[in-house]
Amino acid sequence: MKNIQILFQTLNIFPKNLVLYKQALTHSSYSNEQTPPQEDNERLEFLGDAIVGLLMADYLYSQSKEDEGIMTKKRAQAVCEKSLTIYAQKIELQNYLLLGKGEKNKDFNAKGIMADTFEALFGAIYLDLGYLTAKKVFHNIVLPHLAKTIYIIDFKTQLQEIVQSEKKTIQYKIVQEQGPAHSKNFVAEVYLEKNLLGTGEGSTKKSAEQKAAQQALSKVAKTKDLIKNKGVKEKEL
């Protein structure tokens, strides 16, 4: 096990309660081998799971105007076990982990141990140094690798990029709204000038627009021809 002070230097933090960090780095397999048993990281993992999810939700909400569905999918991918393991490896968290003899020779990445430890670490940082410090550390670790862990397709952005490459603009129009206030259904259409590119339905206006953009992209060759003014039947607004 490396000197934990090196980890603190990597994270650029100045801890007040070292006991919390030792606990965060103590796997239950190690704890059970001690006499008396030491407190393991499972409770901090529980707290850290919520903190990590909140930090990612906070970031996604502040950085975009995407609808709830897209942000939910992005958050799920960004803080899934595989992604958390990647973040843990980037700070070499495995070098500080206290593992029992039976676990040391196993692939603890595959078992989710590193992901759990990453969450426990953020539980410790939150309790010791507060939300703002946890947020700063989280951003420093996660944001450089976010593009590799999020694979959500934003159809509106894709369509917009195609249109902008031809120096054109598109317009979304909500053409239908049905249902009670608690269970609305919307129909959206996306136009290039007077040409209908796609139609979509959704429980929110933004999700309907995403579906409309997706339909336009599914006919990408025809859409590109339209954008380049090669002649496609028009529908009047």
From Swiss-Prot:
Membrane spanning residue stretches: none
MF term (GO), any: rRNA binding
Annotated Mg(2+) binding sites: E45, D116, E119
Pfam families assigned to the protein according to its UniProt record, in alphabetical order: dsrm (PF00035), Ribonucleas_3_3 (PF14622)
Cofactor(s) named in the record: Mg(2+)
Subcellular localization, as worded in the UniProt entry: Cytoplasm
Catalysed reaction equations from the record: Endonucleolytic cleavage to 5'-phosphomonoester
CDD domains reported in the protein's UniProt record: DSRM_RNAse_III_family, RIBOc
Family (UniProt): Belongs to the ribonuclease III family.
Record text on subunit structure and interactions: Homodimer.
Protein name per Swiss-Prot or TrEMBL: Ribonuclease 3
